[in-house]
Amino acid sequence: MKLCVALDLSTKEECLQLAKELKNLDIWLKVGLRAYLRDGFKFIEELKKVDDFKIFLDLKFHDIPNTMADACEEVSKLGVDMINIHASAGKIAIQEVMTRLSKFSKRPLVLAVSALTSFDEENFFSIYRQKIEEAVINFSKISYENGLDGMVCSVFESKKIKEHTSSNFLTLTPGIRPFGETNDDQKRVANLAMARENLSDYIVVGRPIYKNENPRAVCEKILNKIHRKNISENDIEQNYEVIQQKEWDMCNHFEEWIKTRPDKEHALKEFYAKCGIKY
């Protein structure tokens, strides 16, 4: 699992300063529509000069097939490492994009946007007349069958997408709140344990990092958890929401429950199993 830091700050200077603070970390940077329109294509060059960051250019192209292919071709010339398009543009648009990018010796990864994480079921249904999960699976199959590299989706759809396509079909999951932060404008959010359990390949974290007084320390903490194969007893409190999400009703509070266990080691194994983590 890779960490992608969203550069969604108010000014280019703030974004570059954050990038400098995060030098030499094993991370990706996400450049969104706001930053790209404000700072232009040269902003990508400036970020690459700070460090050899992998760049995800998050512009979510959605237009007629030829226009989408033109746009994807142009941004691919910038040397970005990942771009995205809307799956709802259809298979012809997807095919044209991938045909156009096939001429590059090293093209960026191309992911499809399924359902924005700002959608809840009610709002999504009012537009698409489908449940989110049904639409996401349909979009994923179309994207996979027509040569895309993966999907942008919520954590809650990641594992199901792989089940209906391939374990190698990438999933990038926004809306990650690593330490239980507020949802802000996201509806379908999750924590690190959920992302791991649902096989996310990339997680996008923005505000919990750049709004912190020490962004680098937050990134290091996240990376430490990503690279840790198993969780320790110190992670129990931070993963309590996973227990709640699994509707584990052995007691009102996990801390109270584990105190009642004569064999703490066995209790921890049960905890790992409920979180979907190999002990």
Swiss-Prot record:
EC number: 4.1.1.23
Gene Ontology annotations of biological process type: 'de novo' pyrimidine nucleobase biosynthetic process; 'de novo' UMP biosynthetic process
PANTHER family according to UniProt: OROTIDINE 5'-PHOSPHATE DECARBOXYLASE (PTHR32119:SF2)
GO cellular component: cytosol
Subunit structure: Homodimer.
Record's protein name: Orotidine 5'-phosphate decarboxylase
Swiss-Prot/TrEMBL catalytic activity: orotidine 5'-phosphate + H(+) = UMP + CO2
Binding sites annotated in the UniProt record for substrate: 8, 30, 58-67, 117, 177, 186, 206-207
Pathway involvement of the protein, from the record: Pyrimidine metabolism; UMP biosynthesis via de novo pathway; UMP from orotate: step 2/2
Pfam family, one: OMPdecase
UniProt keyword annotations, A-Z: Decarboxylase, Lyase, Pyrimidine biosynthesis
Single annotated GO MF: orotidine-5'-phosphate decarboxylase activity
Function: Catalyzes the decarboxylation of orotidine 5'-monophosphate (OMP) to uridine 5'-monophosphate (UMP).
Active-site annotation: 60 (proton donor)
Family stated for the protein in its record: Belongs to the OMP decarboxylase family. Type 1 subfamily.
InterPro entries: Aldolase_TIM (IPR013785), OMPdecase (IPR014732), OMPdecase_AS (IPR018089), OMPdecase_bac (IPR047596), OMPdeCOase_dom (IPR001754), RibuloseP-bd_barrel (IPR011060)
